[in-house]
From Swiss-Prot:
Protein name: ATP synthase subunit beta, chloroplastic
Coiled coil location: none
Organism: Drimys granadensis
CDD domains: ATP-synt_F1_beta_C, ATP-synt_F1_beta_N, F1-ATPase_beta_CD
UniProt keyword annotation of ATP-binding present: yes
Chain residues that bind ATP: G172, G173, A174, G175, V176, G177, K178, T179
Gene name per UniProt: atpB
Amino acid sequence: MRINPTTSGPGVSTLEEKNLGRIAQIIGPVLDVVFPPGKMPNIYNALVVKGRDTVGQQINVTCEVQQLLGNNRVRAVAMSATDGLMRGMEVIDTGAPLSVPVGGATLGRIFNVLGEPVDNLGPVDTRTTSPIHRSAPAFIQLDTRLSIFETGIKVVDLLAPYRRGGKIGLFGGAGVGKTVLIMELINNIAKAHGGVSVFGGVGERTREGNDLYMEMKESGVINEENIAESKVALVHGQMNEPPGARMRVGLTALTMAEYFRDVNEQDVLLFIDNIFRFVQAGSEVSALLGRMPSAVGYQPTLSTEMGSLQERITSTKEGSITSIQAVYVPADDLTDPAPATTFAHLDATTVLSRGLAAKGIYPAVDPLDSTSTMLQPRIVGEEHYETAQRVKQTSQRYKELQDIIAILGSDELSEEDRLTVARARKIERFLSQPFFVAEVFTGSPGKYVGLAETIRGFQLILSGELDGLPEQAFYLVGNIDEATAKAMNLDVESKLKK
C-alpha cells in the first residue's frame, strides 16, 4: 500500500521523466513495445499509451508487461480495447504495477479493472492506492481457528457448512442457479454480517451486474443518501471486456478486500462470479503470448495462476477474508482442468445439479456431491454431524433404488425400502427453499432458516414422525413448522374439492 499525494489517475503516478517506448506491433489486445537500450520495464509494470487516433479522438490505454522478448522489446496485454492504436505511438512506462484505490473511498462504488469508477458518481479519492500484484501472507501470519459461517440456507448449513475465513466454491453448468445462489448469499450474509463485502464480477453478464447493483441499492447494502455508509465495493470486468481486463479484475477486487483485512483489521466477504472466466481469460492471453497449450487447450501455467490468486484469499491474525466463488463447469464435467484445479483450494464445495434443477428443486444443490472440511463432529457437534450423515445415507439409498423403481416400480420394494424412499423424497423437497432474491420470479417470500431449526426439521423427517404428511407439503418452505402448516392447508383444500 502507498499514499499518493498526487496522482494523475488511478494507479498511474506523475508520468514525467518516465521511460518512453514506441509500439512496434499490435496483435488484437497484445502490443509489442520497443524501449531504448537499458531502459526496459519490469514484468507486470503498467504501460500507458496516450495520443489521438486518425479521427482525432483521445486515446488512453493501459497495458501490463507480460514478457521481455529481447532486442529491447516487451510484450504487453491491454486492459481496454486497442481500437485506434497505431505503430510508432509513444508508450510511457509508469515504473510500477497497476495500482487501484483502496479503503473507505471504494465503498458503494463500481470500478473497472484499473480502479476507475464507472458509475457516473464522480471521482474517487485516490490518495491511498495498492498494487494489484503482491505476495500471499506468510505462514506465521495465518489464522487457523475453525468456526462455522451460518448462511440461512438449509442444504448448505446442514450438509456442506461454510468456514468463517474459508474459501467456498459454487460449482455448476450453465443455467442451474450459481448467480442466484451467490446473490442470495450476499443478501443473507452481507446484511447479517455487518462487515464489508467486495464483489468481483469476472467475465459474466453485464445485465446481472446491473441487477445486483440495483438490488443492493434497494436493500440498503449500498446507501445512496450517504455513500460512505455502504457495505460493499463492486469491481466489474464483464464478458465484453478484453481478456487482459478479465484476467486481472479478480486481483483488483482482491486487493481492495486485502486492505480492509490488513489495514482496517476487518472480516471481509469476497464474492467472485465467476472464477472460471479468470481461467478462461488466462487461456486467451496465454495463446496470444504464443505459449504452447496444455490439457484441453488450457494455459500451461493454469495451476500457478490459480494459486497466485487463491493463496492471497486467506485469514490472518489481523482479519479474515471469507471468499465465495462461483465456478462454471464446462459441459457439466467436474474433471475439466479448470474446475478440478479450483477444487484443490476450497474448504467447502457446493455442487449444483442439473437433474435437481430439472425437477424444480431450488437451490439445486446436490446433497451427495457437495462437501465441506467443516463437517466433523469436533467442529459442528455430534447432533449436527449425525443428522447430516443420516440425510446423506437416506439420499444415497434412494439414488441406488431409482433404477429398480424405474424398471419394476416401487411396489416391488421391501417395506423398509419403501419407507426410505418416501422419507428421501420428503428430504429432497425439504432441501428446497424460497429465496429472497427470487421473490420477484416465484411470488413466494424468501426464508432464512437458522441452523438449529434446520437440524430439528430433518430429525423429525428421519424419525418418522412426519411419515403421514404428503411430500408436496415439504416443497419450497422454510422451517418444518411451515411444512406441517402447508400439509394442513393441502388437507383442507382436498376436502373442499370433494
